[in-house]
């Protein structure tokens, strides 16, 4: 339970997550905006909420602001840093490739164990910033 000032019977514990923390996938990058979007929901189907983090300004494959999302499964009530997963458009699960200013990970939703990821800056059919969403069936 959260107890920020140390008042009461339960002491507080705060864990700071970023891409400079050992075990977290990816590398820290100026301006990547890790944590722009955060969602706690059970996507690993173990009955415990996991943490999804959007980093829409992350460089992917040399494309600035392409974006990623990170999944931190929870183990014993804490985010697992050694089993986190990083998702981006250059992975084979996604059609296409990373685009500059695609902003993948600006929004995240779930439908059961599936992930729905917003990419509002995605160019589509030659139209700039037309936007797209990705449905990742897990």
Where are these regions (language model features)?
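Conserved beta-strand/short-helix segments
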Residues: 1-138
